[in-house]
Amino acid sequence: MYIIAHRGASGYAPENTIAAFDLAVKMNADMIELDVQLTKDRQIVVIHDDRVDRTTNGSGFVKDFTLEELQKLDAGSWYGPAFQGERIPTLEAVLKRYHKKIGLLIELKGHPSQVGIEEEVGQLLGQFSFSINNIVQSFQFRSVQRFRELYPSIPTAVITRPNFGMLSRNQMKAFRSFANYVNIKHTRLNRLMIGSINKNGLNIFAWTVNNQKTAAKLQAMGVDGIVTDYPDFIIKDGKHENI
């Protein structure tokens, strides 16, 4: 089972920053989940929201900034003074820093401004084909499908919305044609659904789990990965995965 650090160890450090990613590595996470978008000058940056307002000292849409402009913003002070000066990283910088240390679960954001992001991310990942483990995912099923068509050797995942119900056999068959994993909100999962998904040839990630008892229950039910803000408190193989 994969322990997947949600935007890094974001329970302890500002999300989607090198500080959060370094901490995830120290906490022995198996993967880092992160979000990518394209800048005005078509550079791939790691940030969740379509605007910079919540997680930086700037204001405006990511798509309206060049990379140089974005990297002048402070992406850490909003979380705490200890993280002042953290910057929005590029996906390339993240791959260079971590490709031999930890896997990446890369979410393609589905904003209208992100046309062509599948090609951009796939080309970059091709330069790091010797990485430990990379998986590309999205809430936008067409984006995952497009990525699979372009880069069939790179594993993919579909993320389902919180209100997504029980997957039908036809839905699972459709997903299986372009994805290896289904990433489902943990409150929607039960033993019956997990068994059904596995029987239909898909692996399962559960997002976002920040309760130890819930994590243990999901592990016992057979999920293949747990996405969490606190990768150090997940119990794996009978042991805490601590620093």
Swiss-Prot record:
GO terms for molecular function: glycerophosphodiester phosphodiesterase activity; metal ion binding. Binds 1 Ca(2+) ion per subunit. It catalyses: a sn-glycero-3-phosphodiester + H2O = an alcohol + sn-glycerol 3-phosphate + H(+). Residues 1-238 form the GP-PDE domain. InterPro entries: GP_PDE_dom (IPR030395), PLC-like_Pdiesterase_TIM-brl (IPR017946). Its cofactor is Ca(2+). The keyword Coiled coil does not apply. Pfam families: GDPD. Belongs to the glycerophosphoryl diester phosphodiesterase family. This is Putative glycerophosphodiester phosphodiesterase YhdW. It comes from Bacillus subtilis (strain 168).
